[in-house]
């Protein structure tokens, strides 16, 4: 351990002012320093001074300086300080828990001499030494002190051991004395231990020895029994002075001694068992150390000095940071401090046995400490500061720790589970188990306190997968073992350990009651289960149901509610309990009934007052009633009678409540008079016994107290007179007779004649008793009494009276007995028969009336049958000779043997119908032979067959059937029966039936249908062995589809289809299976291929490991290369077989070469070290440059071969010069010579020979001469030469043939020259026919080499005009072709023109085509999309052509959405009245009125263009055949609409015309057949709203919203037209295909309409005019008169009409003047344009005084 100076707590003074004593509190939070001026300073753990107080003298008269403080110590709870003073007193000050609390003296102990030292080792016990040598004990609880031991020598030092249970005192004479309060089993001696050479002022008691030092400057370490262990002698050190004080670390592993300017540190070495001195802490000017105090956690040491200074030191062996979250400070080998860096909390971990702490871990969500020493294990909970140390032998660090339980650490090691409770130094217990899963272990440690049970510690765990053991951890014995039929996968005890829940793998939830050892299954399909914390309420989930057991004692009573997700947890807090359920992506909380939970908890805890208080808050329901009943029962058992009274009141049990109330009053009175609870008073106990209906116990309690009267009163109150009289008799009570009389009188008064009769009978008065019995209507009792007394039988009148009463009461048997007794057999027999007493009747008849016996036997049998006593009736029927009845009775009684016996005695007809019933019984007993015999006797053979069939006895059934049925009927029967068996799932039986009738195919089909493939295969193999293989294959495919792979494998392999098996496993990723099958069934190399594919699927090192494991690595690399998987091959070789890499590179290069990737192949060849292969590759592909480059760079020896190869290629291309150069570079002139010879180029051959191989020249010349003679020619030159020779010889025909044979692809000039020469010779010298043939051959050949003019000239020489023209056409020499046609044969002029057009078309030369064929050119423009050029060109043509292409362009634009450009076309070129164009005009109109952004002044020109085009169209229609047609009228209407739109846009540009614009928007509504209705109503509503016409706006917006809804729904059926009745706004309008108003604007309208509707300030009616109709309607509904619309507003003109020249055109004068005035004031050009159009449309304007100049 090392000391590091931290801070100065108290600065030293200039002179002597020593610190007399210091002390740290037990909780490490406070540090006290007592100075020379007797003031106690209090510091916090960080060294900040927080408080102080002054000590006081024993007697103030001596003054404050009359004493010194010699000892000071904190109490174990850190709230008090004991101060030992030299004025013979000890004060105990209560300083409180908080700083600043008032300091009060709570104890004082006056002594006989000065207190010299003081310790406070344990609660209430202060130990102190006195100057007179005594060591005494002060008890703060009793406020008394006593002497522990006494010596004659001044006590100079006092210390305690680490546990505080032993004290050590040092005395002035050197004596050191030891005393134990508890030696803790150490066996160490007490008393004088050692005599030190000097007074041991510095005395410390460490773990393993005692260290003492003093003025002799020697430090001595003594053993446990006082022998010297070590001595440290500093007497010869001139720097050292006397040792004044010592302190041992809290762990006892270190000791610090103080002297002058120095602190000496000694550390105990456990390994060497000696003290080792550390480097001393020397501080100049510290002066003498007078006091030392070590913080309880060992982390700080404080030293007080002679000059009044206090220095604080940090003490540690080492420090480390754990996971950047915790600081571990080792203050000693066996002690360390764990500090949480984030929260600052600290825990002191210490080995109580002094073992060195070796390893510290913080586990379990950083809450739990685990540390090892050599022999122990340290555990701790950082949150609760509960620490444990248990013996633990090292197990190699293989322990597994589980921290799921907050009270217990579970340690699993080598199959053994050890439980350690935090804060306990003993393990709770150990058990053997292999199942270390927190869900399979449940520990409950005092989790809920119960009445009468202080400790409750239980464990449940798995012994094996199906056996649960429950252990009581306190006693260490087994309290329950549960053996279950299936594997357990979860278990948990409840908090009290009385119930165990567990769930098995079948998701069945079971509850086990430990006390009764009963197991109950409470839920199926349980996916979640948990006890509610703090209660015995259980929550579980079953599929979509949440199940809650509020009372687990009644597991059948479960509260269920439906949920839609999965339960994920429980949360309890804030007075409620919630079950958290995930529903999709959200979590929903289901709240439980907190009241029911609370009640159960209160009951379990025995807190019945709390349970009552809770129940009083609930309404009375069946569940609440059950809880009240439970509480009443428990309260009675616990003798809590007031609670029980309240329960019965709540339950409405008034009598019990009242009875308990009276009982409580008795108990309370007794309690007040005699003390105690009062429930033990005998009256209270008796009344409780009465409440439980245990009257004998109550009687016994009364009689024990000799309270006979009270017992009798009890019985009388209960009307139990018999017991009352019995008590009176037993106790000889004087009122016995009176009781009896009173009882009899009471019986008579209450008409209890029977009881009175019994009383009289018991007293011997028979007649009176009979009279009372008869009066009570009990003649049977009277008869019984008469029959027992002969004297009463003699009374005939009495007997008659009784028999009459008996017969009247239908007690015939008793009457018969009486008649028989008085010898009247006839009446007796009648009575017996009436009373069904046939036994007595028959016995009487046998004696008195024998003839009646048979009749009576039959009647007796009938009676027994009625009584269902059929068995007894059989013999009676036999006696009565009633065979049929006997048979029926035997059958009914199931007396089958008797029935057979009786049947065998009957004739066949009678018996036949009964045999089958008996046979059915024997068939059910499987006694088939007897049953068959009976069926046969009963002529029911078919039933016998069915019996055998159902029993599976097909052979017997078939044998029997063949005897009595046709074979085909047998087949039908068996197949039908087999189908029934199949339906019942009895497939084997069905199979036997099918096979029996030789229909195995039906059985095969059945097995296939039900997927019983083994049986199917068995039958196929037996009956169709030729189809067995195909069947296996088919089944394999089916099973593979179903995912039943192992079964599929079997069938594939049986079908010899191992490849299918392998592919199946491969596709499912089951490579091991695929490999196994391939290796077992696939021949020598199949498994290698599978292994390769497997490895490829893994890739990387995994593939290498696999292949190495299988021993197929090299084979796999070869296989990868063979299959062109070079990347995989490279990967494998790189990872494992690097020597294979060049080979793979070579194979990869060859692959790339085959693929034509030569550059990549070149690189791979070079990487493979095979550059020559790359050269050969390039040579093979005649890439000479690359070949030469590679050869020169990587293989110089191949350069010559490359040049030779290149030369060979040049020769093949007839490039002899190049070939020659290459061969000469390769220094191979001989080869060049041979090539020239082979090519017949003898002149070049001779030249080469002469220049490079002159030695062979002569031989070459001779060879040339021989070759020339042999061939007569030398190639092309030879042909030309030969031709010339023939020409010179006059053989022109042969010369022509030779010229025609010339073919030299390298010289087209030579060929042309030769062919022209041939033609020239043929024309000049050969006959015309021959010359024609030659020209026809030469002409095409010349054309073929591009000599079209020469070919044409040849043709013209022979007047072949068409061929000449074709030659010019093919050569694209059109002018020459035209000239030839024109001059030589005009018939071909059109021919040339047609080809020229085709040529221009094909070449796209439209500009040139225009001059030839304008329509074709225009079509070509259209095809090319050059519309502007097309229209421009068409403009130059006639009107019809122009408008054809205008229409085409307009159609194109409209399709592209460019209606505006289409409109502009017709503005520019006019709108002809072609019916073909009508759809275009309509489409432009529709697109324009549907387009957004047109309801503004800026859109005027667009509307004006539309208006002008439509006006132009209508003007053209008037002049056409379409005048006045429906189309004409429609376009007139469109013109009017366009005019309204244009006028509206114009009006929108001028503020004063806004009402005109609004009216135009409203007028447009009458044209909604042609306009999008939603847009029109929206614009009308908007306009009306802007000018303040809110009624109209409201109605129009309503209509607009209805229309938008109709568009969404796709139908107008739901529209309400009531607002537009009697208007000309149409109801039937086209449904717009889409919304024309954006969503935002629709929402604005919706909000406005809703606001107005809420205000209710508008009437939902349209404004009316003087006609009484809607003001914008042209038609008056009442008269049908139609008004003209105003040209300016569209509204009807009712007066002040201005008429125009054109009929039907007029304007309202006011609107007209308003419009003119606006134009005059604004000079608006658009409004002027409107007037201009009206003038043009209506034939001029009316006379007006306004001028626009």
UniProtKB/Swiss-Prot annotation:
TPR repeat coordinates: 593-624, 692-725, 809-842, 854-887, 912-945, 947-970, 971-1004, 1042-1075, 1142-1175, 1276-1309, 1345-1378, 1411-1445, 1447-1477, 1574-1607
GO cellular component, one term: nucleus
WD repeats, residue ranges: 14-53, 64-103, 110-148, 150-191, 195-233, 238-278, 284-323, 483-520, 521-559
Compartments in which it is found: Cell projection, Cilium; Nucleus
Crosslink feature (Glycyl lysine isopeptide (Lys-Gly) (interchain with G-Cter in SUMO1)) location: 4
Pfam families attached to this UniProt entry: TPR_IF140-IFT172, TPR_IFT80_172, WD40
Keywords, ordered alphabetically: Acetylation, Cell projection, Cilium, Developmental protein, Isopeptide bond, Methylation, Nucleus, Repeat, TPR repeat, Ubl conjugation, WD repeat
SMART domains noted in UniProt: WD40
Omega-N-methylarginine PTM sites in chain numbering: 672
Function, in words: Required for the maintenance and formation of cilia. Plays an indirect role in hedgehog (Hh) signaling, cilia being required for all activity of the hedgehog pathway.
Subunit and interaction comment: Interacts with IFT88. Interacts with IFT57. Interacts with RABL2/RABL2A; binds preferentially to GDP-bound RABL2. May interact with LHX3 and LHX4; the relevance of such interaction is however unclear in vivo.
UniProt record similarity statement: Belongs to the IFT172 family.
Name of this chain's protein: Intraflagellar transport protein 172 homolog
Organism: Rattus norvegicus
């Amino acid at each position: 351990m090392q000391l590091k100076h931290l801070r100065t707590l108290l600065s030293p003074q200039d002179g002597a002012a020593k610190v007399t004593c210091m002390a740290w509190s037990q909780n490490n939070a406070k540090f006290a320093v007592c100075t020379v001026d007797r003031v106690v300073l209090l510091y916090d753990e960080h060294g900040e001074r927080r408080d102080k107080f002054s000590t006081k003298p024993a007697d103030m008269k001596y003054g404050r300086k009359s004493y010194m403080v010699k000892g000071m110590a904190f109490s174990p709870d850190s709230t008090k300080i004991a101060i030992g003073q030299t004025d013979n007193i000890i004060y105990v000050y209560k300083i409180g828990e908080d700083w600043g609390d008032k300091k009060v003296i709570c104890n004082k102990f006056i002594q006989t001499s000065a207190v010299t030292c003081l310790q406070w080792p344990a609660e209430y016990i202060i130990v102190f030494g006195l100057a007179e040598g005594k060591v005494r004990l002060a008890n703060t609880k009793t406020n008394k002190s006593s002497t522990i031991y006494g010596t004659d020598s001044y006590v100079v030092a006092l210390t305690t051991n680490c546990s505080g249970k032993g004290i050590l005192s040092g005395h002035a004479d050197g004596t050191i004395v030891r005393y134990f309060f508890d030696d803790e089993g150490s066996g160490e001696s007490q008393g004088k231990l050692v005599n030190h050479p000097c007074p041991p002022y510095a005395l410390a008691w460490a773990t393993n020895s005692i260290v003492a030092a003093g003025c002799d400057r020697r430090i001595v370490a003594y053993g446990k029994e006082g022998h010297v262990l070590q001595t440290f002698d500093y007497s010869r050190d001139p720097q050292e002075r006397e040792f004044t004080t010592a302190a041992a670390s809290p762990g006892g592993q270190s000791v610090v001694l103080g002297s002058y300017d120095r602190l000496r540190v000694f550390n105990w070495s456990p390994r060497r068992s000696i003290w080792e001195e550390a480097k001393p802490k020397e501080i100049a000017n510290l002066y003498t150390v007078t006091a030392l105090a070590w913080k309880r956690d060992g982390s700080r040491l404080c030293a007080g000095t002679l000059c009044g200074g206090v220095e604080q030191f940090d003490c540690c062996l080492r420090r480390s940071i754990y996971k950047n979250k915790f600081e571990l400070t080792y203050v000693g080998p066996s002690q360390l401090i764990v500090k949480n860096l984030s929260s600052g909390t600290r825990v002191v971990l210490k080995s109580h046995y002094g073992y060195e702490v070796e390893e510290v871990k913080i586990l379990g969500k950083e809450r739990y400490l685990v540390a090892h020493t050599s022999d122990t294990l340290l555990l701790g909970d950082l949150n609760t500061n509960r620490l444990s140390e248990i013996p633990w032998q090292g197990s190699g660090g293989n322990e597994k720790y589980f921290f799921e339980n907050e009270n217990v650490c579970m340690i699993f090691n080598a199959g053994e589970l050890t439980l350690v409770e935090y804060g306990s130094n003993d393990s709770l217990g150990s058990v053997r188990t292999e199942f270390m899963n927190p869900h399979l272990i449940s520990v409950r440690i005092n989790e809920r306190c119960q009445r009468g049970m202080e400790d409750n510690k239980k464990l449940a765990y798995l012994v094996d997968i199906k056996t649960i053991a429950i252990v009581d951890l306190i006693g260490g014995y087994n309290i329950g073992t549960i053996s279950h039929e299936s594997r357990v996968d979860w278990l948990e005890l409840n908090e009290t350990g009385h119930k165990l829940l567990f769930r098995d793998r079948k998701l069945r939830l079971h509850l086990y009651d430990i006390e009764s050892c009963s197991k109950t299954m409470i839920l199926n399909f349980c996916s979640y289960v948990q006890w509610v914390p703090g209660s015995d309420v259980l929550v579980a989930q079953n599929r979509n149901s949440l199940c809650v057991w509020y009372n687990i004692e009644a597991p059948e009573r479960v509260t269920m509610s439906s949920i839609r997700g999965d339960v994920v947890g429980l949360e309890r807090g804030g007075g409620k309990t919630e079950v958290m359920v995930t529903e999709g992506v959200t979590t929903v909380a289901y709240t439980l009934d907190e009241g029911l939970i609370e009640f159960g908890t209160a009951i379990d805890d025995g807190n019945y007052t709390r349970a009552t208080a809770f129940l009083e808050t609930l309404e009375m329901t069946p569940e609440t009633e059950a809880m009240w009943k439970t509480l009443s029962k428990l309260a009675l058992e616990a003798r809590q009678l007031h609670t029980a009274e309240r329960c019965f009141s709540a339950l409405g049990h008034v009598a019990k409540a009242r009875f308990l109330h009276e009982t409580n009053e008795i108990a309370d009175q007794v309690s007040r008079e005699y003390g105690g609870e009062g429930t033990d008073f005998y009256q209270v106990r008796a009344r409780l016994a009465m409440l439980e209906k245990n009257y004998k116990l109550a009687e016994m309690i009364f009689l024990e107290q000799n309270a006979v009267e009270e017992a009798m009163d009890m019985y009388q109150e209960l009307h139990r007179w018999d017991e009352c009289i019995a008590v009176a008799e037993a106790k000889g009570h004087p009122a016995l007779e009176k009781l009896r009389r009173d009882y009899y009188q009471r019986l008579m008064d209450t008409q209890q004649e029977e009881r009175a009769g019994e009383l009289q009978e018991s007293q011997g008065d028979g007649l009176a008793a009979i009279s009372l019995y008869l009066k009570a209507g009990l003649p049977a009792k009277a008869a019984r009494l008469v029959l027992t007394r002969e004297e009463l039988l003699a009374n005939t009148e009495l007997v008659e009276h009784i028999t009459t009463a008996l017969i009247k009461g239908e007690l015939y048997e008793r009457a018969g007995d009486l008649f028989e007794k008085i010898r009247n057999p006839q009446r007796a027999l009648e009575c017996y028969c009436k009373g069904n007493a046939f036994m007595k009747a028959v016995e009487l008849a046998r004696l008195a009336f024998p003839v009646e016996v048979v009749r009576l036997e039959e009647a007796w049998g009938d009676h027994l049958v009625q009584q269902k006593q059929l068995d007894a009736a059989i013999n009676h029927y036999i006696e009565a000779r009633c065979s049929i009845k006997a048979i029926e009775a035997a059958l009914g009684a199931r007396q089958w043997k008797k029935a057979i016996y009786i049947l065998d005695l009957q004739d066949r007809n009678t018996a036949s119908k009964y045999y089958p019933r008996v046979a059915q019984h024997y068939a059910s007993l499987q006694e088939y032979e007897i049953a068959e015999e009976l069926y046969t006797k009963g002529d029911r053979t078919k039933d016998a067959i069915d019996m055998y069939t159902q029993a599976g006895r097909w052979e017997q059934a078939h044998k029997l059937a063949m005897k009595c049925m046709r074979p085909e009927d047998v087949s039908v029967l068996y197949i039908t029966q087999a189908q029934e068996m199949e339906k019942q799932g009895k497939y084997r039986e069905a199979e036997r039936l099918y096979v029996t009738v030789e229909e195995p195919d039906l059985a095969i089909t059945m097995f296939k249908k039900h997927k019983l493939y083994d049986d199917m295969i068995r039958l196929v193999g037996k009956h169709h062995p030729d189809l067995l293989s195909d069947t296996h294959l088919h089944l394999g495919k089916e099973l593979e589809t179903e995912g039943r792979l192992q079964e599929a494998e079997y069938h594939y392999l049986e079908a010899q289809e191992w490849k299918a098996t392998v592919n199946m496993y491969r596709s499912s990723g089951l490579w091991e299976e695929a490999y196994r099958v391939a290796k077992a069934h696939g021949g020598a190399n199949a498994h290698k291929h599978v292994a390769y594919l497997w490895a490829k699927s893994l890739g990387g090192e995994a593939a290498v490991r696999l292949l190495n494991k299988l021993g197929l690595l090299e084979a796999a690399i070869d296989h990868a290369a063979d299959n062109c998987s070079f990347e995989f091959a490279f990967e494998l070789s790189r990872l494992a077989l690097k020597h294979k890499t060049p080979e793979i590179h070579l194979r990869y290069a060859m692959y790339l070469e085959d693929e034509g990737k030569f550059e990549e192949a070149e690189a791979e060849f070079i990487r493979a070290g095979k550059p020559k292969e790359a050269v050969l590759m390039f040579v093979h592909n005649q890439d000479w440059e690359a070949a030469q480059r590679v050869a020169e760079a990587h293989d110089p020896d191949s350069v010559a071969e490359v040049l030779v190869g290149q030369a060979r290629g040049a020769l093949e291309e007839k490039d002899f010069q190049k070939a020659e150069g290459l061969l000469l570079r390769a220094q191979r002139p001989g080869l060049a010579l041979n090539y020239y010879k082979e090519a017949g180029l003898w002149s070049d051959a001779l030249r080469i020979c002469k220049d490079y191989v002159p030695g062979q020249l002569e031989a070459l010349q001779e060879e040339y001469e021989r070759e020339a003679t042999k061939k007569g020619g030398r190639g092309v030159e030879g042909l030309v030469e030969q031709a010339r020779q023939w020409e010179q010889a006059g053989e022109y025909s042969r010369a022509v043939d030779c010229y025609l044979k010339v073919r030299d692809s390298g010289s087209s000039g030579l060929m042309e020259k030769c062919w022209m020469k041939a033609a020239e010779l043929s024309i000049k010298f050969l006959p015309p026919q021959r010359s024609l043939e030659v020209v026809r051959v030469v002409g095409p050949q010349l054309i073929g080499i591009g000599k079209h003019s020469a070919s044409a000239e040849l043709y013209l020489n022979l007047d072949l005009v068409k061929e000449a023209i074709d030659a010019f056409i093919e050569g694209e020499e059109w002018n020459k072709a035209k000239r030839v046609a024109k001059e030589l044969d005009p018939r071909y002029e059109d021919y040339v023109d047609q080809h020229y057009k085709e040529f221009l078309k094909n070449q796209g030369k439209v500009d040139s085509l225009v001059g030839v064929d304008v329509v074709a050119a225009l079509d070509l423009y259209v095809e090319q999309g050059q519309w502007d050029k097309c229209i421009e060109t068409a403009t130059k043509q006639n009107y019809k052509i122009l408008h054809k292409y205008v229409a085409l362009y307009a159609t194109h634009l409209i399709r592209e959405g460019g209606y505006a450009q289409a409109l502009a076309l017709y503005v520019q070129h006019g709108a002809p009245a072609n019916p073909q164009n009508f759809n275009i005009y309509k489409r432009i109109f529709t697109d324009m009125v549907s387009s957004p952004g047109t309801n503004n002044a800026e859109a005027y020109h667009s509307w004006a263009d539309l208006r002008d085009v439509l006006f132009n169209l209508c003007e053209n229609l008037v002049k056409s055949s379409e005048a006045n047609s429906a189309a004409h009228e429609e376009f007139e209407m469109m013109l009017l609409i366009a005019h309204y739109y244009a006028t509206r846009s114009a009006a929108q540009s001028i503020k004063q015309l806004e009402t005109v614009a609004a009216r135009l928007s409203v007028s447009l509504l009458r044209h909604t057949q042609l306009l999008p209705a939603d847009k029109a109503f929206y614009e009308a509503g908007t306009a009306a709203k802007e000018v303040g016409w809110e009624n109209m706006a409201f109605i129009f917006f309503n209509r607009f919203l209805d229309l938008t809804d109709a568009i969404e729904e796709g139908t107008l059926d739901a529209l309400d037209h009531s607002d537009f009745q009697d208007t000309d706004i149409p109801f039937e309008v086209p449904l717009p295909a889409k919304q024309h108003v954006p969503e935002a604007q629709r929402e604005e309208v919706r909000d406005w309409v809703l606001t107005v509707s809420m205000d209710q300030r508008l009437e939902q009616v349209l404004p009316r005019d003087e006609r009484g109709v809607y003001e914008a309607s042209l038609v008056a509904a009442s008269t049908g008169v139609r008004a003209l619309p105003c040209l300016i507003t569209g509204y009807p003109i009712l007066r002040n009409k201005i008429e125009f020249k054109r009929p039907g055109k007029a304007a309202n004068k006011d609107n007209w003047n308003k419009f003119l005035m606006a134009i005059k004031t604004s000079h608006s050009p658009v409004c002027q344009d409107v007037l201009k159009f009206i003038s043009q449309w209506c034939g001029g304007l009316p006379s007006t005084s306004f001028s626009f100049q």
